[in-house]
Amino acid sequence: MTANNLREQISQLVAQYANEALSPKPFVAGTSVVPPSGKVIGAKELQLMVEASLDGWLTTGRFNDAFEKKLGEFIGVPHVLTTTSGSSANLLALTALTSPKLGERALKPGDEVITVAAGFPTTVNPAIQNGLIPVFVDVDIPTYNIDASLIEAAVTEKSKAIMIAHTLGNAFNLSEVRRIADKYNLWLIEDCCDALGTTYEGQMVGTFGDIGTVSFYPAHHITMGEGGAVFTKSGELKKIIESFRDWGRDCYCAPGCDNTCGKRFGQQLGSLPQGYDHKYTYSHLGYNLKITDMQAACGLAQLERVEEFVEQRKANFSYLKQGLQSCTEFLELPEATEKSDPSWFGFPITLKETSGVNRVELVKFLDEAKIGTRLLFAGNLIRQPYFANVKYRVVGELTNTDRIMNQTFWIGIYPGLTTEHLDYVVSKFEEFFGLNF
């Protein structure tokens, strides 16, 4: 039997295993867990991961190349670089803007980055890690995104960038944010880690800014276990991001390749001797943030299902929102940003001030009913313990940010949930509020 025959046999056995082990289990109310997020994988994902492992090419290779190309086609950008997580993607995106190759536009310590405090820490942390000052403005409820009308008041001569996330897949007001970025010559980074497939005015989010990022953690729209990607329309920024990702080296050869530039031994950079091997010449203080080809193989299979996943998220969101209309005396339900079509990551809920309900009581009740909940990440980031010694600036009041910290949580709408799950969720909310009983 040849190696190829064995590969085919292994692939068939993997498919048989997947069909047996990964088939959805029947939903049993009160017994089955309704998680806030999760992965949906099947035979193709396992088959491609096994195929990648049989290749024996452990770092980025043919599967990664195919994944980057296909993701770029889906988003509508020419340059995609995979990395180890969405947080790493954010770190690379922001750090790239500190490159001396950008001349006067390079971010320098003490420069300011406008953002929000109601979100995930690693949207903001890269600014701090690069010696920059985060400047916080408040958000809007029920979109949970930056209140774009407050941004211009935050702009000073030190302002150099805007870096914000599309909260739980709901696009922020891109037309206004883009207008302000253009007016004041600010870089714009779109954190799309929770928003793969979201569009604004019919255009994919992540393509309005200078750089976009996405995450492939199991909770997200598609997964490769861990993993993320940075993407851009700019060839210059692509090379800088790649350098920071790959140890800071000036060379951009793919793994296993040499002399792509044709000048490997023909350059003199820094105070190195003439002809010093370009493969070991470093122009940035970089990292090693690449993924394995097995991860990319899983992601490639997931990309074949991304449109299906996005549509199911939208359908689950609409179904749940319709079901929870019975509870609007107590709950403020989410709204899509005008001109956006969100690929929802989760379903955010805020308790109304008049509800007379404590959030802890409600989420504890849901937890006991096996319905998973999550808070809106850090709540108000500046109230987190690690922010005690961080230098930052706040413009105006963070009233809604504090309200989110105290009264908001979210529940799941990921593609692994069926209408049976969602009907059960609605029934438990109604039971808690004493409705329809």
UniProtKB/Swiss-Prot annotation:
Tell me the GO BP annotations in alphabetical order. O antigen biosynthetic process; polysaccharide biosynthetic process
Q: Which UniProt keywords apply?
A: Lipopolysaccharide biosynthesis, Pyridoxal phosphate
Instruction: Extract the Pfam families matched here.
Output: DegT_DnrJ_EryC1 (PF01041)
Q: Which cofactor does it need?
A: pyridoxal 5'-phosphate
> Pathway membership of this protein?
Bacterial outer membrane biogenesis; LPS O-antigen biosynthesis
Q: Which GO terms describe its molecular function?
A: pyridoxal phosphate binding; transaminase activity
Q: Where on the tree of life does the source sit, at the highest rank?
A: Bacteria
CDD domains registered for this protein in UniProt? AHBA_syn
Family statement drawn from the similarity comment of this UniProt entry? Belongs to the DegT/DnrJ/EryC1 family.
Q: Which protein, by its recorded name, is this?
A: Lipopolysaccharide biosynthesis protein RfbH
